[in-house]
Amino acid sequence: MPLVALVFLAVNLAAIGVVARGSRTLWLLPNLALLTFAVLYLLPIFTRPISDSIFLPILTANISLALAALLFRGLPVAARRHKPPIITGNVFLLLGVLFCSIGVFAVYQSLVASGGLTSVLLDYGGRGYLAARVNGANSGILGVLAWASPFGLAMLLAAWLQQPGRYGVFSVFLVFFGLVMGGYFLLTVRHNAVATLLMLAAVVFRYRGFKLRSALLFALPLVAVFTVFQAVRVAGVGQLGLGSIINSTSQSAEHLEVTEYMIEKTRFDGYTGFSQMLDLPVFLVPRVFWPEKPRTSTLNRLYFPEQASVGSEKSPGIVAEGYVSWGYPGIIIVSFAFMGLLSFVQARFDRLKDPLAAALFAAVFVPYTYMGVRTGVFGKHLVPVIFIYLEYLVAMRLARLGLRLRPRAGNIRPD
């Protein structure tokens, strides 16, 4: 199996190289999905034995994603023409500060609700904090609001890249970056931290173009964040060290274990028929209007009912989600739908003429690219993407409003 995995890893890299041609951003979103899949599903095969029951679904998903990426790469993309930024002055800076403040408030309010700033890190450890935090009436909305800070950081970084001489803006960015990542570490939430770094990478690549040096600069903190956060969740901060990091990383195959368990159980219980798609309207309803709203996703209630009371989530990932929905055809459907959406978004991303708007548009969907492979394509994980997209629409609406008001202020400059 490791030899076959090595072959498919090479196929993944070849597909990434082919679809990246002709795109200033190397066709970022679909390629990020392929790379994430390789890291999460193919690389662990070299460190742990797995059965045929999970190996074949993984390869089916891998082939489907690669083929879909190649097929959808033919989407027409208009020529890019760069125009002056659509947002100028301090409006953009203020929006970034506003979104960062909302996200930071949500993260630290979650810490307070769980017993104190360091209670999750020192007292509970791992997933234990969910029992203390998730039963709060505002836990759901706080989790959604926490996604405001990554988009705010993307706005601040884009504002600085737009005018690199404004080091005051960069200083504000660094302050909020420290607060945001510090809060994520105290909560031991990996998804938010990894997605934040990926969003910032998308902004930099859109402004500066893809460079190997920049990619390595982002890859190193990504690896550090994922491994350290994983070690903290598995071993606890008291046992944190090089040995625990290496051990937890080499044995970190929870998504593979969950995938294997769900596939085996499905063969006895039957397919779910994409019932997880009902999660999206359910989780968009505030708990204040529906006190008995489920605390976990449909798939978790079906496959892990013993943990539903504390809201713990076992991430099925794209492979298990597709298989439990409709077997191997389900894997193909989910893979093609996921890659089709990413390719459509990427085509629009490359068509946007303004670099600032393009950078923010990419930042909206980068978290979904990572979470779709890691936690599932459909269901409640779409809620953060919808929230971030609403933030994007607010920013663009204010930009258009500013363009309408600018002629009245006499601020039009001749071309």
Where do the PLM segments sit?
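Membrane-interface helix-loop-helix junctions at transmembrane boundaries of multi-pass membrane enzymes
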Residues: 20-28, 156-172, 347-360
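Hydrophobic alpha-helical segments
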Residues: 155, 314-415
